[in-house]
Amino acid sequence: MYILWLDAAEFENKGGWKLETQFVRAVGQSYLIACDIPGDPVNDAIAEFDVKENGRYRVFVRTKNWKYPEAPGRFNVIVDGKELPAVCGKMPTQSWYWEIAGDIELGCGKHTVSLHDLTGWLARCAAVIITDDMDFVPSPETERLQKQRRQIKGISDEIKNCGEWDFVVVGAGPGGVPAAIAAARHGLKTALITGRPTVGGNASREGTIGLDGAGSRHLGFHETGIANEIKRIREYKNCTWQEAMELLIANEENITVFCNELCIDADTVDSKISSATTINAITLEKSVFKGKMFADCSGDAWLGYYAGAAYRIGREAKWQYNEKFAPEDADTLTMSGCICAQPDPDKRKFRGYRAENTNNPVIFKAPDWAVKLPEGDELHRTPMGDAIDSPWWVENSNDFDDLWDDEFCRDQLVRIAVGYFDWVKNSWSGKEKCTNYKLTGLALHNSKRENRRLIGDYVLNQNDFDGRTDFDDGVTYCGWSIDLHHPKGLFSGKEGPFYSNQNVPLT
């Protein structure tokens, strides 16, 4: 009996497919996604494999129909140049599933398997299984799937011990990086852990969101502390926020960075965190980090959640803090993220989509699965700048769950971005400005806004901002407007994109 398991990350030649690691917690593994020029099929992803005996083999793929029923992301599997019969990615479900791509006669020796994109619209493949056991069926359940994978690949389920640390920081974004640097400068042996391939979080080249605060609203003012050090390096070096953080981290010998390590559990002793467990987003190897102190800078408060800390999601009712902008009744609404990208540090970053002026008329017809927006001025929006990407207000309504349904939310943002480009090209009253625009890229990283919030000894609320509250244990000055987007997102009509945009007083 022969069973070969190929992870998406193991494809040596990924062609035009990109490795997606944002959703390992939900999907159970990383996956390849076909994304380059929207609507143009990408180059094949190719992997080599060996079989030891001549015979008939079955090929499974783990895939997803990410928008049922239209099935935008369809692909074929090709073995040794022969196309297998199934068109993958179109089953009537939006869950991840295993599909038989086909059976094929193989001789002993080396072979190739290719993923052949058919649409150019985000086809997905997480794994390929090749077996001569016609009774074998891979499990659809994430936990059992990972167990099957370990057994087939001969991987131990032992958790790797990554040592003991003075300070463990989970999350390496605008919160985690300064926390780690401050600790390192005080002599603490610090582990800086991120589930992403780089540091930076929302300010990385994936996220593209800057560390802007009150300094961007008040002439002559700027943020203080380590955040300002990062900003000064960025301005002096003319580099990205991510590169500025990397330069600052490199100067601290007490910091060790662990990328692609996603926090999935925590242990406590007497209600104090003693260790954090992570899973590698690519290899799925588990590790444990023991420490004397921990900081949850994960953005979604995963460490605190696993440790059993109190938390809230959504908006508190007005009676709780008597905040001017609070609703009368509590709810679970959270602001949508935006999909963002900067594929190359020398190229401009963009939100939603990227369009380029071809200097010749270009026709664009939106796919059936793109979100259909109100015609013309009925959308009650005016594109910002030259409309070569989408504004910050191209977002989901606030009842979408970015925490537990994050892949679906990202995909909905893709549908909205394509629908918005269609509106700009074909419906907006100023559409003649975009006659020569061609859709050339889609952003895939969901730069999230607020989500789960851990409850500490003091809850900062709107009255602290309005009343200029000073705190004896303050460590820095920062700020932004009370920037609340409309709960209906892009679909707020004549009510506009803001629920509040009130400036915060300087102290």
Segments predicted by a language model, with ranges:
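Beta1/beta-strand and adjacent pyrophosphate-binding region of the FAD-binding site
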Residues: 161-173
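Loop/turn elements at helix/coil->beta-strand transitions in domains of secreted/extracellular proteins
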Residues: 164-166, 186-190, 253-256, 287, ...
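Flavin (FAD/FMN)-binding glycine-rich loop and adjacent Rossmann-like elements that form
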Residues: 156-161, 202, 260, 275, ...
